[in-house]
Amino acid sequence: MQDTAKYLIHADITAAGVVERSDVVGAVFGQTEGLLGDELDLRDLQDSKKVGRIDVEIRSEGGQSFGEITVASGLDRVETAILAAALETIEQVGPCRAEIEVSEIEDVRSAKRREVVERATELLNDFEEKSIQTADIVETVRQQVRVADVTDYEGLPAGPRVADSDAIVVVEGRSDVMQLLKYGIKNAVAVEGTDVPDAIADLTAGRTVTSFLDGDRGGDLILKELAQVGDVDYVAVTPSDKSVEDLSRSEVMSALRDKVPYETVASAKSLDSIREEMSQAGESTTADGGAVAAATSDDAADNQPSPSSQTGSAKVETTDGTTSVVDNSNATAVADATTDEETTENGDGPTIPSLSDHIEAVIQTHSGTARLVDEDATLLAEGDADAVVSLLESTEDVPKTVVIDADCSQKLLDVAAQRGVDVVVAAGHGEYVKQPTAVQVRIES
């Protein structure tokens, strides 16, 4: 009955003499019989399993007896209270005067509810510790894919296209290879230290080799030794105070696009010096951009490319298996990736808007719309701000930035993290509990 009881009646008993348990039980049944009528007769209630057994704990001390009576009840609250009050009418136990006082009517279900709450709290805490957030799932999958793509070339970390590609990118460590894989470059190989392995030296023979090293002391040493034991065709340098593994996609592509022939910087003392020379050359090229473009156009019309000019192009293997050619000679055409940009500079093509232009058009004009743009600020999709989540889910290309004339919501952040969006530019902070670590929120008003 204890397992199905709703209430427990606790009563204290005091007897002026020595009594035993059987005396107490007999007094309870005997002196309550007929007191409450047939419906609440204690024996009938026990027979129908509405009242459990009567538990008595009794002890004698100094010629008196003390103890506790416990009765399990399956009746409702009113009937249980009546039954408890009936116990207090008992005045004699065996041959001794006695007094019974109900100390408590315990609600067994309340105790069970407390246990349920405590246990549920423990289970929930364990569950939350083991659960994976949406952003964590996305990042975990990305990392596992990157690690899976890292292959082994003569014991060195490398992209899957290193062995069969006619162009390779030499980097310092495994993390650099993984970073380039993240951006779709699959022909990178790591030297794993300042001592260039023989496998790398042999690999550079007969291939177009681009060194892409950190601009620190270690990078300087690797470049010098690589040039001594192998062949280096081009040098790409990272932005100041940055490592390859810390670069964004646009920074990686820009560095590889702007690489220079090794012969032109062979006398440089360090990668920092090369960076300075490239910066000065870039300023000079910008000043004379129109003339260079015109000369390039004439040369392309009058002359076929020679073998030497063809070797002036470096190749980068991308995720789709195609080979994009990036030409770094100041006298030849630039890479396809920059054709539209240079056409714009020469005034022959449409102007590509910047991210600031999108923000102004969407948020500052209170347009009530949303735009999805890529890393070059090219518009991928546009729609109503209220439908930005479905717009983001249905867009085939992964946008880098979402610009929305509305508050940033939790749903938008979750979907943005799933799609791999880097930045959400919104008109205001919305109600969101958790911001994914991979998504930056920027407020423009």
From Swiss-Prot:
Cofactor remark from the record: Binds two Mg(2+) per subunit.
Cofactor(s) required, per the database record: Mg(2+)
A Gene Ontology cellular-component term: primosome complex
Keywords annotated in UniProt: DNA replication, DNA-directed RNA polymerase, Magnesium, Metal-binding, Nucleotidyltransferase, Primosome, Transcription, Transferase
Domain Toprim: 166-252
Organism this protein belongs to: Haloarcula marismortui (strain ATCC 43049 / DSM 3752 / JCM 8966 / VKM B-1809)
GO BP terms in the entry: DNA replication, synthesis of primer
Protein name, per record: DNA primase DnaG
Family affiliation: Belongs to the archaeal DnaG primase family.
